[in-house]
């Protein structure tokens, strides 16, 4: 008695969390307008990459500087998408700094 429910899973990644949240809201709003059920955006753990370099060129090993790069992630599930939903999502214009992975 299992239904054949279709699901679109969208993972968003970005360094800027404000652009990421705006993109997620655009996707959710577009999917809801076209008649699909939306679950999310779910915030996934932020990935933090720390890079340590020496400030001096030759010696002074104790003098170091650290830089970090944070990758923010969100997950959106679109349940029972209609062809209108898929078409609307394809035409959606999102910022350049946001990486999108779509799985059907």
Swiss-Prot record:
Coiled coil: none
Keywords assigned: Ribonucleoprotein, Ribosomal protein
PROSITE patterns in alphabetical order: RIBOSOMAL_S10
InterPro entries reported in the protein's UniProt record: Ribosomal_uS10, Ribosomal_uS10_CS, Ribosomal_uS10_dom, Ribosomal_uS10_dom_sf
GO cellular component: ribonucleoprotein complex; ribosome
Highest taxon above the source species: Bacteria
GO MF annotation list: structural constituent of ribosome; tRNA binding
Record keyword Ribosomal protein present: yes
One of the Pfam families matching this protein, by short name: Ribosomal_S10
GO biological process, one term: translation
Presence of the UniProt keyword Membrane in the record: no
Function text: Involved in the binding of tRNA to the ribosomes.
Subunit structure, as described in the record: Part of the 30S ribosomal subunit.
Family from the record: Belongs to the universal ribosomal protein uS10 family.
Protein name: Small ribosomal subunit protein uS10
Organism: Alkaliphilus oremlandii (strain OhILAs) (Clostridium oremlandii (strain OhILAs))
Underlying gene: rpsJ
């Amino acid at each position: 008695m299992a239904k054949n429910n279709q699901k679109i899973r969208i993972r968003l990644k970005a360094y800027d969390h404000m652009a990421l949240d705006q993109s997620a809201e655009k996707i959710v709003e577009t999917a809801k307008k076209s008649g699909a059920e939306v679950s999310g955006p779910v915030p996934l753990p932020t990935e933090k990459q720390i890079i340590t370099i020496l400030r001096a060129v030759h010696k002074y090993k104790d003098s170091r500087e650290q830089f970090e790069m944070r990758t923010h992630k969100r997950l959106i599930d679109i349940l029972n998408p209609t062809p209108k939903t898929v078409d609307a999502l394809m035409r959606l214009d999102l910022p350049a700094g946001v990486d999108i992975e779509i799985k059907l």
